[in-house]
């Protein structure tokens, strides 16, 4: 079995840093430090991590988003419970009794409240609560909570970086630290080699809340072509095989009206030529990734999408196969 220790170490470090959309500094700082080993780095006005290597050929941008899904505190009620809203597409079905960290004036442990099954009404059995019914218990009364927590503070879901059997790992924020890890590993493989293009890298903020980091970062870089790396749907026992890709069988190459078909075909040809496993991912319109924003940046950018299949997307236990990175 191939040793994936290098990419595993990169991914574990990235997943250990926090960075909910709009408050990405922890994760962005970690990514910037790692990117600085390969190129000059700066942070954009929105906080995206940007870098560039000079070259004489076409200007190509590699993008992956650095933000992760989470929650944002909206209010503190009279009993000291924190009311929250989604920051990105958190899966409400798995939130009951979840352990979280509230990033206030200091990091505070919390648990999302859960109604005991004994007290739930028959009509509510098996149903997820509406978001306005969710609260976080931090073990404090309102006065004490107000000293440490303010509306707007971000909340992350707790979870460990788990090494599974074989080459699979599970962790919060694999979406999209796996894409960031792929680019960093690519740069390591390119170190010391001549390349015939000008290469820019963008670890963009705020993808989970609309893609503003990618749109502004691509405008600043002004590339001729771009490749975004993100995650997509991996195999699951309760989902039709037509709707996902298999874990461990390679990166997904995107085909969509919003993507440049010549680039997608070229990427597939290179993968075949080099013996790199890949899988097609066909979409009928927009991709739901940063490609949608990069494509319309400036006067337009030819864009391709490479996605890593994962399971349990938008939960604290996202799972991927390192072979696909």
Model-derived features: positions:
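N-terminal hydrophobic/helix-forming segments and targeting peptides
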Residues: 1-325
């Amino acid at each position: 079995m191939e040793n994936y220790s290098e990419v595993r170490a990169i991914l574990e470090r990235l997943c250990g840093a926090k960075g909910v959309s709009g408050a990405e500094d922890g994760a962005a700082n970690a990514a910037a430090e790692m990117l600085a080993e390969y190129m000059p780095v700066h942070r954009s006005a929105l906080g995206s991590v940007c870098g560039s290597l000079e070259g004489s050929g076409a200007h190509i941008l590699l993008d992956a988003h650095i933000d992760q899904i989470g929650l944002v505190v909206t209010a503190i009620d009279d009993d000291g419970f924190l009311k929250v809203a989604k920051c990105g597409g958190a899966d409400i079905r798995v939130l009951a009794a979840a352990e979280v960290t509230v990033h206030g004036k200091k990091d505070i442990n919390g648990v999302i409240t859960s109604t005991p099954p004994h007290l739930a009404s028959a009509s509510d059995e098996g149903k997820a609560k509406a978001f306005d019914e969710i609260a976080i218990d931090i073990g404090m009364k309102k006065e004490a909570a107000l000293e440490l927590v303010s509306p707007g503070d971000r909340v992350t879901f707790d979870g460990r970086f788990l090494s599974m059997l074989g080459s699979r790992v599970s962790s919060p924020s694999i979406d999209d630290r796996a894409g960031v890890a792929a680019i960093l590993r690519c740069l390591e493989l390119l170190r010391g080699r001549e390349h015939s293009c000008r290469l820019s890298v963008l670890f963009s903020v705020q993808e989970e809340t609309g893609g503003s980091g990618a749109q502004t970062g691509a405008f600043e870089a002004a590339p001729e072509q771009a490749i975004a790396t993100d995650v997509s749907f991996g195999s699951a026992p309760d989902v039709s095989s037509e709707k996902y890709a298999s874990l461990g069988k390679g990166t997904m190459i995107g085909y969509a009206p919003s993507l440049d078909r010549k680039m997608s075909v070229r990427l597939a040809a290179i993968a075949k030529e080099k013996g790199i496993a890949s899988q097609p991912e066909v979409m009928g319109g927009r991709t739901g990734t940063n490609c949608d924003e990069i494509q319309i940046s400036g006067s337009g950018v030819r864009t391709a999408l490479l996605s890593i299949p994962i399971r349990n997307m938008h939960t604290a236990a996202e799972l991927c196969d390192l072979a696909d990175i």
